[in-house]
Amino acid sequence: MANVRCLYKLIRLQKLLLPLNATSSRLAPLQPRPLTFLIARSYGKDEKKANLEDFRAREEQRERERDAADQAAEKASQKEAGGGGGLGAKGSESTGPEDDAKQAKVDAIRAKILDAALQHVPQQGWTRQAIILGAEESGYPSVVHGMFPEGGFALVSHFNGKCNAQLVESLQQKTDGGKQEVEDPLDFLVQAVRQRLEMVTPYKTHWPQAMALLAQPQHAPTALAQVLTLVDDICYYSGDRSVDFGWYTRRVGLATIMKMTELYFLQDKSPGHAQTWEFLKSRMDEAVQLQMMLSQTEGMTHTFQRSFNSAFITARNILGLGYNRN
């Protein structure tokens, strides 16, 4: 009987020493983690590490592309200079004229690439892809598009500058450099605006995209400067050499009419854009009447004159131009 009692106590003691249920015991959090949890946690760390490594790899690749673009531009400018003996190494000191000459060569390369890219705009739009195709056709590697950090706007701005220069050259020929008096200044203005808008015709389908790029805040100063400079040149060669308030109202009015006509032009489907040119002529006639009304209002003349004068000077400074047309 004593042995039975001892055995009974031993069984009770053994039960007390057995591990408690993991689901109900306070010691459950101290139990070892399942192997699947450890694997999942390890996999999560590996995934984060892989994402970080991918990010670093992308950034390093972009940095290499930028370096390659700079090197390509350097080699291209040396090639244009016949070996680049005057450019020197990056670490060597250079004088101001040498820097200007180097920048001029880079600008020439940019212009060459952008000229070639224009033929791809009807298919690619005003995009970086068009610039890449233009670079490849010009004999430069595709990574040279790094020379154009502004993207498609560089192409639009180049096109506008090129067209403006062509128009000014045409106006100079018609007026003998501004020396010959224009018989009908109003018709001269109408024909000048028409000639400028007709240059957009090959790119009419994608021109809304170009206008959107020009309207972006970071591009607005250059875009506005190109417009103000163009209307100033048109008015100058039309014979407008006055220094009164009309000098400003005519230029601002012409810029407004140009933009209105440009929007009408994009929606016009008439043969030869005949309705656009009728719209342009009507707006010009209205502008003449408005200018006559404003010329009779002397109260705000000086205020407007100071504001407009500052705007036109700023526009030419942005483009690196002056008022010397000789």
From Swiss-Prot:
Compartments where located: Mitochondrion
Keywords tagged on the record: Lipid-binding, Mitochondrion, Transit peptide, Ubiquinone biosynthesis
Gene3D superfamilies linked to this entry: Tetracycline Repressor, domain 2
Main location: mitochondrion
GO biological process: ubiquinone biosynthetic process
Binding site for a 1,2-diacylglycero-3-phosphoethanolamine: Y248, T249, R250, R251
Compositional bias (Basic and acidic residues): 49-78
Recorded metabolic or biological pathway in which this protein acts: Cofactor biosynthesis; ubiquinone biosynthesis
Top-rank taxon, per record: Eukaryota
GO CC field: mitochondrial inner membrane; ubiquinone biosynthesis complex
Annotated segments matching region Disordered: 49-103
Similarity comment: family membership: Belongs to the COQ9 family.
Function: Membrane-associated protein that warps the membrane surface to access and bind aromatic isoprenes with high specificity, including ubiquinone (CoQ) isoprene intermediates and presents them directly to Coq7, therefore facilitating the Coq7-mediated hydroxylase step. Participates in the biosynthesis of coenzyme Q, also named ubiquinone, an essential lipid-soluble electron transporter for aerobic cellular respiration.
Protein name in UniProt: Ubiquinone biosynthesis protein COQ9, mitochondrial
Organism field: Drosophila melanogaster
